[in-house]
Amino acid sequence: MLSFLRRTLGRRSMRKHAEKERLREAQRAATHIPAAGDAKSIITCRVSLLDGTDVSVDLPKKAKGQELFDQIMYHLDLIESDYFGLRFMDSAQVAHWLDGTKSIKKQVKIGSPYCLHLRVKFYSSEPNNLREELTRYLFVLQLKQDILSGKLECPFDTAVQLAAYNLQAELGDYDLAEHSPELVSEFRFVPIQTEEMELAIFEKWKEYRGQTPAQAETNYLNKAKWLEMYGVDMHVVKARDGNDYSLGLTPTGVLVFEGETKIGLFFWPKITRLDFKKNKLTLVVVEDDDQGKEQEHTFVFRLDHPKACKHLWKCAVEHHAFFRLRGPVQKSSHRSGFIRLGSRFRYSGKTEYQTTKTNKARRSTSFERRPSKRYSRRTLQMKASTTQPEDLGVLNASAQKSDSQQAWGVMSPVPVTSSSSCGAVQVEIENLPQTSATEQHDRKCLPLSVDLLNSPDLLETTIGDVTRTSETSAPFPAPDTINVATRSNELEEFKAECETLKDDTEKLKQLETEQTILPSLRPTIDINVNSQEEVVKLTEKCLNNAIENPALNAVKVPPDFKSNILKAQVEAVHKVTREDSLLTHKNASVQDAATNSTAFNENDVPVCKDSLTPVHGTAADSASVLKDATDELDALLLSLTENLMDHTVTPQVSSPSMITPRWIIPQSATISNGLAGYGASLAGTDECSQKDGFSLISPPAPFLVDAVTSSAPPLPEDSTLKQKCLLTTEL
């Protein structure tokens, strides 16, 4: 029976011990310190350091708090350890400092493992007294946590400077190519961190260039020590009136706050007694009255729990001993009696005086600064308002690549309005919002004539006129013949041009050189008119051609251009003599065309006879010259009519190779020119046909196909004008 119980209990004990071992292994941190030695009973303590790392320490079951504290200090290689302590939370969620003179298991009731936190216990009133760089680094980490948690309140300007020191210590000098304002949003410095603060931190960080991490941390501490609540250990209490107050323990004394208002300060030398009983804390202060006599004032505060009251009392005793005494109070070796009143707690560590006098900095120390916790980066909306653009073109280009941000300085579109000026202006075609009828295109700035877009005589911009023309007139015939009309409102100009034809020989040669290579037919111009504004979508090729081609422009045709056309026609007549067979064929064609045409009016365009003299040549030489002249005139006519478009039903056009232009010299007195009801009639003269043997070519004004009727009013009849025949072509 006894053996059975022994085996059963033994197995249970072994099984229980194995489960504890597995639990300790699972709960161990990345850094493990086995300090239990050969002890059979082991406890595991897990300590959270200031840099965010965890350390697990195995200790004997009856180990005291000082043993755990020494293991952590040895792991950190920290000499100035009296400023720090290990803190834990009890079942009532009251924070306590681990007492080095008592057992860990008796103090920390929650475990195993027993969780503790390394924190700064006493904030040095003068950070320059901290000799070790590691000590200052840990102080900076503690203050950073205090500001982030809201325990240490900080003004905006001071918070910006402290955050900039943190960036300088962790990231080094600011680099334009590597660092951007959005980088600040990856860090957290204050509870409520706005974009304005992040931009201010970023700009302040640039000013701290050249500081080493140690220098930045020293400047951080020297700035933080002037904060009102620096190093204040706050405890919430209640007074006799039932209102909540806060007692703050500082190196100089005890502060009393009502809400956020400081209402009193009790200096340590003036405090004569400080004790507690259950949840009541008694504070006796000696002050001088008006007569110079000392008077005692007693203050009684209540706390929610007796443990909280005792914790406040112990913290007050430690602050008084550390900052005010040269050395700790020695405990008496003999007992005062069987009955002992009050707590036996006494501060057993070194004082600030001892720490600054005895500790000396080592010659060489090395430690690793761990990076801070990063958060997701956010895009700053205020970035554009803080950066002045240097080049509007660069910003506009970047805005077209990404539509999420609004570009700076986007130029407003130039409206297309009618103008009396015929000069070319710079018009910027602006993108419009995408609709069902339009699509967005790239913006272009092209030379464009304003009158070209608004001229009522231009077929591309007057769709309504074309519609009305097609309704009232006959449909366009097949392109067997091309009738060329003249505008009678240029009569006086032609008189002056006839006198200067001899001076335009060089211009004619240049025109023939430019028209040697014929451009291909351009696509038609797309016109879109909405309710807001008129937008003409032109390709660059079409737009330039519309400007260069005077036949499509509604403005006045330059005189030199008309002179060149006239000169080409005159030279063709002077150099060409028709063969008998060709003349016979042409006369027959003219007679057929004359039967279907209308009579000309008497307001004929005169031609100076002095400048138009027929040239007679042999039939063998005129054959080759006729072909060259025909090609040149064909190029001129094609350049004039290449951009005209027909909005009616497109007729069947034969191959370009089958169309051969032939110049016809009318022999009859009257020929027709234009559609029925729209052509202007001119009267021919018999004297010209009989005297010269063939009709002379009359110099036309700007040439327009009869599909686009001239809006100029007809001139009155002039009997003094001499009548000439009009040149026509047959395809």
UniProtKB/Swiss-Prot annotation:
Kindly state which keywords UniProt assigns to this record, in alphabetical order: Cell junction, Cell membrane, Cytoplasm, Membrane, Methylation
Please report the record's description of how this protein sits within the membrane: Peripheral membrane protein
Q: Which GO terms describe its cellular component?
A: adherens junction; cell leading edge; cytoskeleton; cytosol; focal adhesion; nucleoplasm; photoreceptor inner segment; plasma membrane
In residue numbers, the region (Disordered) covers 352-388
- According to its UniProt record, what is one Pfam family this protein matches? FA
Enumerate the subcellular locations listed in this protein's record, separating them with semicolons. Cytoplasm; Cell junction, Adherens junction; Cell membrane; Photoreceptor inner segment
Keyword Cytoplasm present in the record's keywords: the answer is yes
FERM domain sequence ranges: 43-327
Q: Region annotation Required for interaction with CRB1: residue ranges?
A: 29-119
Q: Under the GO molecular function aspect, what terms does this record hold?
A: cytoskeletal protein binding; protein domain specific binding
Which Gene3D superfamilies does this UniProt record tie to the protein?
A: 1.20.80.10, Phosphatidylinositol 3-kinase Catalytic Subunit, Chain A, domain 1, Pleckstrin-homology domain (PH domain)/Phosphotyrosine-binding domain (PTB)
Q: In which tissues is it expressed?
A: In the retina, expressed at the outer limiting membrane, retinal pigment epithelium, outer nuclear layer and outer plexiform layer (at protein level). Also detected in the inner segments (at protein level). Expressed at the basolateral and apical sides of the mesonephric tubules in the kidney (at protein level).
The cross-references to InterPro entries, in alphabetical order and at most eight, read: Band_41_domain, Ez/rad/moesin-like, FA, FERM/acyl-CoA-bd_prot_sf, FERM_2, FERM_central, FERM_CS, FERM_domain
- Polar residues bias: start-end ranges: 378-388
Give disulfide pairs as residue numbers: none
Function according to Swiss-Prot or TrEMBL: Plays a role in the formation and organization of tight junctions during the establishment of polarity in epithelial cells.
**Identification of the protein by name:** Band 4.1-like protein 5
Which organism does this sequence originate in?
Answer: Mus musculus
